[in-house]
Design a protein with these regions (language model features):
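Sec-exported extracytoplasmic/periplasmic mature domains
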Residues: 53, 64-72, 87-96, 194, ...
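C-terminal segment of classical bacterial N-terminal signal peptides
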Residues: 18-27
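A non-catalytic alpha/beta surface segment that caps or lines the substrate-entry region
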Residues: 62, 72-125, 129, 140, ...
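Active-site metal-coordination/substrate-binding segment of hydrolases
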Residues: 119-208, 514
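Metal-dependent amide/peptide-bond hydrolase catalytic core
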Residues: 29-31, 37, 43, 246, ...
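Acidic/histidine-rich catalytic neighborhood of metal-dependent amide-processing enzymes
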Residues: 167-256, 531
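Bacterial N-terminal signal peptides that target proteins for export
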Residues: 1-14, 24
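N-terminal hydrophobic or amphipathic helices/low-complexity stretches enriched
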Residues: 29-78, 136-137, 257
C-alpha cells in the first residue's frame, strides 16, 4: 500500500494530506510509496509526458479558468478571487494551504507538502497578479483566453480549446493577460504534482509554495509578509518560477536577477506656453532641458555616466565567465528579427550586457506632435526612467548618486510641483519622484544547491538547460535573500516572444508542456542530486 504525503510547517508535521486529489475530470491515483527507489530523470520525464498527453484538455481548462479572473494588483476584489482560486488548486492536490497577511496589500498564498524520507525543503515561488491592461491595444479581450494556431504576429487564427481526450499542437498559443507572466508557472507546478502522483513518484524534497499577489505592483508589502512568517517559510532553498526561456529556445537555469528601481523627472519652463517666435532663444525650453539632462546620465552606447554609479558592481566570477561563454549567440538573429541595424556597446553580446547595470528611458512627455504640434515653448517636460541594478548596488545608494548628479548639473530638486517663490529663485528646477525598487541577486553557481538544481533540471532532458548567471529582467529575489538568508535560483518556462507586460501576452503550448516536465524533474530529483553534490 502506498504511503501518505504529509503537510509540514517549518519542519513540523501539522496534519496529514493525501497526495491524490486531481482536477475535475482526472482520475485520482494512489500516492507514491516511500519504499520505491528514486526514479531517474528519464523515467520522471517519461511518466510526466505520458500523464500530460492523456490530460491536455483538463490542464488547459484549469489554466483558462485561472486566466479568466482579472488580476491587476490594484483590483482588490479580483485579486482576492485569484488568491481563492490558487488555494483551491493547491487543495485539490492535497496541499495544506493558507493565506499570509498582506500587511495591507494583496495576500500571499502559501502551501506545504511533506514527502516521505525527504531531508530538505524547497519553496517554489510564482506570482498570481498581472500587469495593467489597455484593452484597446489587444486583439481580443485580455481576460477572455483564446487558443490560436500559432503566433498572432504570423497571422494565427483562433481555434477551439481541446475537448476531453484531445491533444493540443505544441506551436499553438494561449492568449490572455498573465498567460506567460506568471500563471503558466502556477499551472505547470500543479500539473507536475499531478504527473508525479499519477506515476507513483515521490518528490525528493519537502515542498512549500509561495504565490505572491503584488509582484507586478512592486512587491511593496512583501518584506513585511516575509518577516512575519520566517518560521513558516523556513527552507533550504527557493526556486523562482518566472520569466522566459533563452532566446535560442532552450530552457535555462538562472542564478540571479537584476534589481530595479523607477524614477519620474519633471523639468520646468515658463508658467504658461509662450510663442516660440516671440520668446524662442530667451525662455528656457523644458524639453531641451530634459533631453540634455538624460544625455548627461547615459550615452548612446548605454554607458551610465553618473559619477560613482559603477563603482560597486560585483565582478563576474570565473564560473560565471565560463557559463557566459557556453550561452549560444543569438544577437544576429535578434537584430534581424527586431530590425535593428546595430545594437549598443559596439554590438556586444546580449548575454554580456545583461550582466551590467542599465538606465532605460521608458517614456517622455512634452508638448504636442504632428496634428497637435504648436509653435510654442512648453511649460514642462516629464521623463520616466527605470534602472536595472546588478549585485552590490542598492536602491538607496543609487538614489543618492542620481540626486547628486542632478545637483551637479545645477538643478534644484523638489518633490512636488514648485511654488512661485521656488520658480523665481532657482533657474533650473527638477521634480524627482522615486518608485519602490529592490536590489539584484546572483547566487554562486558552484554551491551544492546550485549544482544539484542544475543536475536535476538536466536529468533525462534531450537538451539540457543552459546555466545562466543572471536574468535580464527583475524579480524581488533580494528581499527573500535578505529576510530568509537562503539561496534562490530562477527556473523560467515562458517563450521568449510572449509579449510579457504588453498587449497580446501569450504562452506557447509546448513551453507549457516543457515547463511541466522541468518542474516534475526538479521536484523528483533535486533532493537526490543534492546528496550527491554535497561537499564538506
Amino acid at each position: 500500500m502506498f504511503k501518505k504525503f504529509r503537510a509540514i510547517r517549518a519542519g513540523a508535521i501539522v496534519g496529514a494530506a493525501m497526495f491524490v486529489t486531481a482536477p475535475a475530470g482526472i482520475a485520482a491515483q494512489q500516492p507514491a510509496s516511500s519504499a520505491r527507489p528514486a526514479a531517474s530523470g528519464a523515467s520522471v520525464r517519461a511518466a510526466t509526458r505520458q500523464y500530460r498527453e492523456s490530460h491536455e484538455a483538463e490542464i488547459a481548462r484549469e489554466f483558462v479558468e485561472l486566466l479568466a479572473i482579472p488580476d491587476v494588483a490594484l483590483d482588490t476584489a479580483n485579486i482576492g478571487r485569484n488568491a481563492t482560486a490558487v488555494m483551491a488548486m493547491l487543495r485539490r492536490r492535497g496541499v495544506t494551504t493558507r493565506t499570509l497577511d498582506g500587511a495591507g496589500g494583496p495576500p500571499a498564498v502559501y502551501g506545504e507538502l511533506r514527502s516521505p524520507n525527504a531531508t530538505r525543503t524547497v519553496v517554489f515561488y510564482a506570482h498570481y497578479d498581472g500587469q495593467p491592461v489597455d484593452p484597446s491595444q489587444w486583439t481580443g479581450a485580455p481576460f477572455t483566453p483564446v487558443l490560436r494556431d500559432g503566433s498572432l504576429a504570423a497571422g494565427a487564427k483562433v481555434i477551439p480549446m481541446p475537448a476531453a481526450g484531445e491533444r493540443m499542437r505544441g506551436d499553438s498559443r494561449i492568449y490572455a493577460r498573465s498567460a506567460s507572466d506568471d500563471k503558466a508557472a502556477i499551472i505547470a507546478m500543479m500539473s507536475a504534482l499531478d504527473a508525479l502522483r499519477a506515476g507513483g513518484i515521490a518528490p525528493s524534497v519537502n515542498l512549500k509554495f509561495f504565490f505572491e499577489g503584488e509582484e507586478e505592483a512592486g512587491s511593496s508589502h512583501l518584506r513585511r509578509v516575509l518577516q512575519a512568517n520566517t518560521e513558516l517559510l523556513r527552507a533550504d532553498a527557493w526556486v523562482f518560477c518566472d520569466g522566459p526561456v533563452h532566446q535560442s529556445g532552450r530552457q535555462q537555469v538562472v542564478f540571479g536577477a537584476r534589481g530595479v528601481m523607477g524614477l519620474e523627472l519633471t523639468t520646468y519652463g515658463p508658467l504658461r506656453p509662450l510663442h516660440s517666435g516671440h520668446y524662442g532663444n530667451w525662455a528656457p525650453n523644458p524639453a531641451v532641458l530634459m533631453a540634455t539632462l538624460i544625455a548627461s546620465m547615459r550615452d548612446d552606447d548605454g554607458r551610465i555616466l553618473i559619477a560613482g554609479f559603477n563603482d560597486d558592481v560585483r565582478p563576474i566570477s570565473a564560473a560565471e565567465h565560463t557559463a557566459l561563454g557556453a550561452i549560444p549567440p543569438v544577437d544576429t538573429t535578434l537584430r534581424r528579427a527586431l530590425q535593428l541595424g546595430a545594437t549598443e556597446a559596439g554590438n556586444a553580446s546580449l548575454a554580456e550586457r545583461i550582466m551590467a547595470p542599465a538606465l532605460n528611458v521608458r517614456g517622455i512627455k512634452v508638448g504636442g506632435v504632428r496634428e497637435l504640434a504648436a509653435n510654442a515653448i512648453p511649460t514642462e517636460a516629464s521623463a520616466s526612467i527605470d534602472f536595472r541594478l546588478v549585485p552590490n548596488q542598492t536602491p538607496e545608494h543609487v538614489r543618492q548618486l542620481v540626486e547628486a548628479h542632478l545637483r551637479s548639473r545645477g538643478y534644484h530638486l523638489v518633490a512636488d510641483t514648485p511654488d512661485s517663490a521656488t520658480r523665481v529663485t532657482h533657474p533650473k528646477i527638477v521634480r524627482v519622484e522615486w518608485e519602490g525598487g529592490y536590489a539584484a541577486t546572483r547566487a554562486p553557481m558552484d554551491i551544492p544547491f546550485s549544482r544539484a538544481l542544475l543536475a536535476a533540471a538536466s536529468s533525462g532532458a534531450a537538451t539540457p538547460p543552459l546555466a545562466v548567471p543572471m536574468l535580464g529582467g527583475s524579480l524581488p529575489t533580494s528581499t527573500f535573500e535578505q529576510v530568509l538568508g537562503v539561496p534562490l535560483v530562477v527556473l523560467p518556462i515562458a517563450n521568449y516572444d510572449n509579449n510579457q507586460h504588453a498587449a497580446n501576452e501569450n504562452i506557447r503550448v509546448q513551453n507549457l508542456w516543457d515547463g511541466i516536465e522541468l518542474f516534475a524533474a526538479v521536484m523528483a530529483r533535486v533532493g537526490h542530486e543534492w546528496k550527491e553534490s554535497a561537499v564538506p
